[in-house]
Structures are given as structure tokens and as C-alpha cells.
């Protein structure tokens, strides 16, 4: 599945460009974000990777990338990351919104605090980052925004209602954004991975252990 995702970047087209692209990827400490960062660096692009897991993200500095401390729920973190990239590179060509969490439990069982945090990361964190990047892409007259959604942005299954809702919301939001920014030469792409064994899967299982394993929904 990871290979298919990376190949989809080839299909988007920016990788084959003669000029290296300046790319910001969120959630690069593990999983899809880490594999994507390595892949794009191998292709000669300039890659900044943001993650809340600062120490686990430092590998980027050793392979030619730039690691950033970036919690997408923190406006200051987002603003500082974008400001640094613009100061150092003068532009941002590609934004890959990959950071996300999965609350894997029954809708009734999950606290509203965790339900809202699900949306804070998976939707509003993306919105926060996109809003910070768009003025620069509009000034450039070009840019690509890639939102990592999920097959569950189109489908659904039990014990994941809040996650499914956040991805369905992201899909509709991305479709509207695409229509709004097309006039500025900016494209918006949605990638919908299937099940991949990454840290987000492990985290989802922990939420299940916390909430639904011993509830009426887990029996």
C-alpha cells in the first residue's frame, strides 16, 4: 500500500519536474509521512517535515531534509514552520497534509474531548496549515496541496465513527477548497489509503482498549 501511495505522487506530476520542489510534509516521524519524506528526498526535492514527536523526527536532518517541531493544533507552531520555509527558500511548492490520529472506538463510548481532538487534528489542523500556506502559493501563482484522507473518507465501519466523520469532512472540505483556489493556479489532491500498519493503527487500538473493549460495544 505504501508503494502505491508513493507512486501516486508520481502521477500527480510534480516529482518529474526539472526544478526541485520545496515540500512541507506534516506527520513525518513515522508511517506514510516518513516514507514520503524519504522518497521525495531521493528524488532531489527540498523536504521540510513537521511533527509533534520532535526526537523521532530528527532523522530527517541526517538524510538531507529539515525537521521541524510542528503540532498542527498549535497556531504558533504552524506559523513558525511556514515563516522559516519562506525565509530559507522563498516559496512553498507542495504541502502534504499527512498528520492525523484515529480514535477507534464506538461513538457513544468516546469522550467529547477526544472526539473534538480527532477533528482538531484531522480537519482543523489541516485547515490551519492550509490557511498559513495559501497566501504564499497565491503570490507564486502556483502550488499543490495534497491531503491524506482514507478509504473511510468514502466508506465507513463500526468502532470508528469519529475518525470516519473527520475524513468525510476532509473530503468535502478539500473538494470545496479545490474549486476556490483553482483560479490562482493551485491544485488540491486527495489521497485515500487503505489499511496500513503504522503508528496511527496502534494508537487507534489504544483508544479501543481505553473505551470500547469492555463496554457493551466490545462484547
Where are these regions (language model features)?
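Active-site helix of classical SDR
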Residues: 130, 166
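SDR active-site lid
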Residues: 183-219
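Residue(s) in the substrate-gating loop at a strand-loop-helix junction
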Residues: 150
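Conserved glycine-rich cofactor-binding loop
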Residues: 29-30
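A glycine-rich helix->loop->beta "capping" turn
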Residues: 84-95, 103
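The beta1-alpha1 cofactor-binding region of Rossmann-like NAD(H)/NADP(H)-dependent oxidoreductases
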Residues: 70-80, 112
Amino acid at each position: 500500500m505504501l508503494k502505491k501511495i508513493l507512486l501516486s505522487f508520481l502521477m500527480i506530476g510534480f516529482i518529474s519536474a526539472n526544478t526541485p520542489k520545496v515540500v512541507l510534509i506534516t506527520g513525518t516521524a513515522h508511517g506514510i509521512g516518513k516514507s514520503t519524506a524519504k522518497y521525495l528526498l531521493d528524488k532531489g526535492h527540498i523536504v521540510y517535515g513537521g511533527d509533534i514527536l520532535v526526537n523521532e523526527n530528527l532523522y530527517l536532518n541526517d538524510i538531507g531534509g529539515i525537521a521541524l517541531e510542528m503540532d498542527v493544533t498549535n497556531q504558533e507552531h504552524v506559523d513558525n514552520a511556514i515563516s522559516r520555509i519562506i525565509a530559507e527558500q522563498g516559496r512553498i511548492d507542495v504541502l502534504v497534509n499527512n498528520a492525523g490520529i484515529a480514535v477507534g472506538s464506538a461513538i457513544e463510548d468516546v469522550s467529547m474531548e477526544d472526539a473534538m481532538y480527532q477533528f482538531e487534528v484531522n480537519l482543523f489542523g489541516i485547515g490551519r496549515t492550509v490557511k498559513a500556506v495559501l497566501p504564499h502559493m497565491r503570490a507564486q501563482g502556483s502550488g499543490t496541496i495534497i491531503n491524506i484522507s482514507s478509504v473511510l473518507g468514502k466508506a465507513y465501519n463500526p468502532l470508528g465513527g469519529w475518525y470516519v466523520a473527520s475524513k468525510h469532512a476532509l473530503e468535502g472540505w478539500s473538494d470545496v477548497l479545490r474549486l476556490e483556489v483553482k483560479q490562482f493556479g493551485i491544485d488540491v489532491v486527495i489521497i485515500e489509503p487503505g489499511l496500513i500498519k503504522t503508528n496511527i493503527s496502534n494508537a487507534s487500538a489504544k483508544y479501543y482498549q481505553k473505551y470500547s473493549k469492555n463496554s457493551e460495544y466490545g462484547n
